[in-house]
Structure formats: structure tokens, C-alpha cells
């Protein structure tokens, strides 16, 4: 039995190793349980046909679907929604799906024997369902919808019947596949990218059913028994499925992390752990975090949402043909602590200073040895952060993004790295990461510095490109962190030799997370709780919230947020908003909201979790704050807690009775606050 079963990522990181039945980590040549026999690690990697190296692996197509899903949540019209939903399906060409690549990527990290028949069944089923979804279901729904008029909301009867029938059939088929081919026993981890995408589509179909149930004459999902307590059987099915799908994705994501973590405590294990964490965040967890926005009972009008999590790419620069030797000698915890940041409020890079120094016997070649980051938080306060590298002396380059106030701060970099063996050092081999060129650009300007290592035998480290400059405006990520480490380790193959190197790690925010808390006059605005204006304790999120959580405990009982309108002259003090909090509570608590001294009544928050280790999807509840709020030109809200412990996911600002909304939409907004 896997001792990491049902453990969170934090527990897995801190857990003791499981050395029972652990296969050899390298080169897997003699282990009877290894995926490949009589070969080395590089050969085994090459078995995953079609995998090409990139900064985010081969999962860029799937990450693009997250953008479409976010855009769908913010879509103000049904017509736009049809176009966006249709575009999601277009990411899967008829002749080749991206899923075999992602399956191979996942399997390359967890190192389990692939059941190719299960993979073929799942990918074939998904491609078939997506074809039906796009060419039959969406077409029938659009054709019927276009015939509806206020006097006849049911539209053309024949088109209505075709739309009803195709909705019932595609909903049933996705539901069955998610319980069957997409979750086949023994392949759940490698199938997670397929499962998460299929679950996203199924929830969108249930959203359509909830929205058009009366006009289409829908009764209940096909094959689902009627329950007398369910006013809307499709809403009941939606709530059941969102919990089931979220729990499935998080459970098998944690299992995948556990399988990698149990291999050992060396750097190779960390490298693969971080890669699995990053790429599953991009293709699974990001989507899971967006599932709740499909609930039209909670989000009846367009919703602006943000993903505040950070992903860390592989350290820039390979380490020649000794990469495996180096990382087998490094410690997992050392790399985790120095190549990723501890939990803190949301922030962004303001400037970066790069430090270089000359290495002896290197013909005066410069190497990157450290960096110093100046970061800015939502409230305008700044802090300096450095990695494990050298940050003394005069920096050779400074990239400053401290332009303007309130503008999106997006940083784009193009980095080329290489390494070199330095001759002439007794009992020592040095491979130092050098930067051929470093460029960073933002709307406020760009920094550029180029320097090279001296001549000599060069190990092939390839080229790492991050958001090419010509495409930066369409980027879905921006640099939020930069960390450098310097280490010297003894070679496993020859303990008398020392191996020295430096490496650069980059952290990335999703572009949906802006640097200010901007509320929108005609949408529900979701503000991540980590975007507080004050330094405040944060804890690791459970995986399905799109970021970390703000911890309101006995030692820190106030969260403060400065707000800004997206378009000031459209708003007056007469426009009302309401506030809703999504949070989990350990013990019964109360919460109130203060807006420049005007406090709301206290609201009791029921206990939903016994401890941090027991947080589940159902642990999070929506707490509606009574009364309307009228924001002036510089609104500020504070969350105040009484005894108990609140873990806050996000704050939601909901417009009330704003003129672009239809009468029905205004009624839907009002219903959000009726207990």
C-alpha cells in the first residue's frame, strides 16, 4: 500500500522516504519492475515518441484551453460563449490529438508500465466525443437558440427537439466515459489530463442544461433517477459531479507526486517532482480551479477570475553530460527550499539585478553567480529577495520594470544558456552555467546583456526560449520570480573530484492574475485572498483553488484589500455592490467586512474541516456579507475574524442592479444572497 495515499503535496514534501520495493533510480537497467530493460535512462526517455523539449513540456495546447475557459467565464453574451466553447474543441485536430504526448509526459515522470490499450481506448473515446460535441451538439444548440424570440422562448419545435436530444445524449456519453475509459483502473494518473478536460466539457454541458432546461423541455439526465428533493435534477447532477471530478483529480495528482517523492531524496527526484507538479498544474489543476465558474446559480453573470499560483520551470542551463551525476548528489530539500519560494502574499517583480564573477582557470570568463530581486506587493510595499547565489559587488545588469502605477506588469525573457568544462584544475571538474544572452521586455522598457564563456569543449545544453519577444503580448504567463543557486558536489563516479555549477530558476504567474485588485462594473470579480495589501501568513492551497490560501488565525485576524475600478467614470457612489467570501473554517467562527470604518454585521461561519489535512472541495463554502457596498474612488475592504480559523480562498465583488443586466439576471444576482 502506498503510504502517501490521500496525502497532500505539503505532506508528501515533508514525509519520510518509502524505500520498500523501491526500484533503482538510475539507470533502470536491471530492475525487473522498470519500464525498460537493458537500456539507460536517456534511452528510456526516448521511448516516449513525439516528446519535444520546451519550457512547459509538450502541454502548451492543453494550457491554452485554460485561457479559453477563463474567457468563457467572462463572456458577456451567449453568442460569444458559443464561439469560445467551440474553440475549446478545435484544439484537438482530427488526425492527431495532443493527448498521447501528455500521457507520455506524465508516464515519463511516474515511470509505470503503460497499458497502451487503455490509453488508446481513452484517447479514441475522447476524440469521438469531442467530434460529436462540436459537429452535432453545439451546432444543434446554436441553430435552435437562433430561432428564440421573447414571444417564443422555445423557438422552432423541430430544432428544439434536435437540441434537446443531442444534449441528453452527449451529457450521458461524457458521464459514462468519465466513469469508464477516462478513469480506467491502473491508468488514472497518466489519464489525468484527459479526465480533467473531459470533466470540464461535461460540466459545461450540465451548465447548458441548467440554463435551458425549461425552454428545451428537459426533465432529468438520462439514466439518473428522479429525487423528490431535487428542484432541478441537472443542478443536483452538476453539484455531485463537480465534487466527484475535483476529488478524483486531486487524489491522483497527489498519488503521482507521492510515487515520485518515494524514490529518494536526491536532486534527480526533485527535478522530476517539480516537473510533474508544474505540468499537471498547467493541464489539470488550473482547469479544476475553474470548474465552479460553470455553476450559473452562483455565477449568473460574467465572472472575472484569476489564477494566482506560481509554477517553476526547470533550472535554466543543463549540466553537460554530467547532469544526472550532479543531481544524484544534491539534496531534494535543498533544491525545493532554494529554487521555489515560501508562501507569501501575491507579488510581482519590480526589478532584477544579475551578478557575475570570474572563475579561476577560465580565461577570465564571466559566469552568472547570483541575482537580487526587488518585488512589489499589492499595497505598494516592496521587499528584496535573493537566492543561494552571490549578490555582492556591482551587478553587471539591472532590469527595471518600475514603470507607471496600475499597469499590467508582465515580464518576458529569452534566455540561452550553455555550460563548459574548465581545464587545468587538479581533482576538480567545473561546469558553470553561462548566459550567452539575457533579454527581458515589458511595456516599460527592456534590459539586455550579453556575455560568453571562453573557448573550450562545450557540452550540448540546447536552448531555452521563454515567451519569444515578438509574441509577448499573447503570453499566458509572466515571470514572477528568479532564483540562482551555486553548489559544489563530489562526483558519485569519483568522490575525489568536485563538481561546481550554478543554475537559474524562474517562477511564473498566470497572466490572468493582474498586479492590482481591479473590480469590474458589469461582472462578478473574484479577488484571490493572497492579494492582500499587508504581509500576512499564507498556506499551501489544496490544489483546486488556483493558488494559496490566506490564513486568518488567532495570531492574525485581519485581511485588507485595496480596490480599483476598471473604468472609473462609469461608476458613482450610487452603484451598489455585494461581497461574498469563499472560505473553509476550522471550528465555528464569525466574519465581518469593514469598508473605511463602516462595518457589516457579523456572519457566523460553520465549521467545515477538522484540520488543514482534511481540506476537501466540500470544505469550502460561500459566505454572503449582508448589505450593499458603495465604493468611492479609493475603496478598501477588511475582513475581520472572531475565534475560529478561517482559510480564505477569494473575495467576490458582485454588482447589483446595474443597467446592462437584464431583469432576469438581476433577479439571479439577488438570489445569491437569500439564505
From Swiss-Prot:
It holds the Pfam family Endotoxin_N. It comes from the Bacteria. InterPro entries: Galactose-bd-like_sf (IPR008979), Pest_crys (IPR038979), Pest_crys_dom-III (IPR005638), Pest_crys_dom_I (IPR005639), Pest_crys_N_sf (IPR036716), Pest_cryst_cen_dom_sf (IPR036399), Pest_cryst_dom_II (IPR001178). One of its GO terms (biological process) is symbiont-mediated killing of host cell. GO terms for molecular function: signaling receptor binding; toxin activity. Belongs to the delta endotoxin family. Promotes colloidosmotic lysis by binding to the midgut epithelial cells of insects. This is Pesticidal crystal protein Cry25Aa. It comes from Bacillus thuringiensis subsp. jegathesan.
